[in-house]
Amino acid sequence: MAADDGIRILPLAGIPEIRIAADLGALIGDAIERTDGALPLSDLDVLVVTQKVVSKAEGAVIDLTGIVPGQEALEFAQRYDRDARQVQVVLNEARRIVRMENGVIITETPHGFVCANGGVDASNVGPDSGSLVTLLPRDSDASAAAIRRAVRARFEVDIPVIVSDSFGRPWRWGIVDVAIGVSGIMPLEDLRGSPDADGRVMRSTVRAVADEFASAAELALGKAAGRPVALVRGAAFTRGDGSIRDVIIPGVNDLFR
């Protein structure tokens, strides 16, 4: 579904610093009510929520003061001027180490994501965070579903929810926001077998729709503006019981493993 009058991205203002065990769904609901132009909610809306606030609300946070680094972490940290405790957390959270080189650790997470530092991050944890780092949510689809249920119960509108995070990309500098959890939306649009604008049959085109929503929302949210949630209104998507697992390429099909 899509609107005829273009796409709008509406950052939700007034969401406070998220604490562990905060009712994130209720806080997002409060912000929706305060946001001019965002109401009434529409079935053309998609809610994008950044990973950091989800992780904090769910308690996916580790205090580095309790971490004892092993020899591998100590050697890597000394060589590249890293915090050995944080390196150890990255190693602990990894299903598989892809590369450890030039101060960068690329891991495969238990979710199947391949990313720098396994999603372990000390940025935007909070002004009094001290030695805290956040982890990725254990089940980002479930996180998205919980927020979706809270919004639906409050506003009686069922809008899809995407949890987003910043990932780097091979062979390109810079990061972009991608989806790491979805609820109520199909994360991919398979166009294979459909004709293109010239009538040619597309053979390999599969759009990463959820990633596109995540990146679009980031244009309005920014990295340091303290705005972790946005409504994306009017963009085309397909409703359904999609999972972020749908976007993970199986090992047998992955040319880079």
Q: Could you say what each language-model-derived stretch is?
A:
Residues A2-P16, Q51, V61-I67, E72-L135, ...:
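A structural signal for small-residue-enriched, beta-sheet-centric alpha/beta enzyme cores
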Residues A22-L39, R138-I159:
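Phosphate-interacting basic helix/loop segments used at nucleotide- and nucleic-acid interfaces
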Residues L27-I28, K56-A57, R169-P170:
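Conserved SET/PR domain catalytic loop and adjacent active-site segment
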Residues M1-V46:
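N-terminal glycine-/serine-/threonine-rich phosphate-binding loop
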Residues L44, V49-K52, A57:
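Short, conserved active-site loops that position catalytic residues or coordinate cofactors/metal ions
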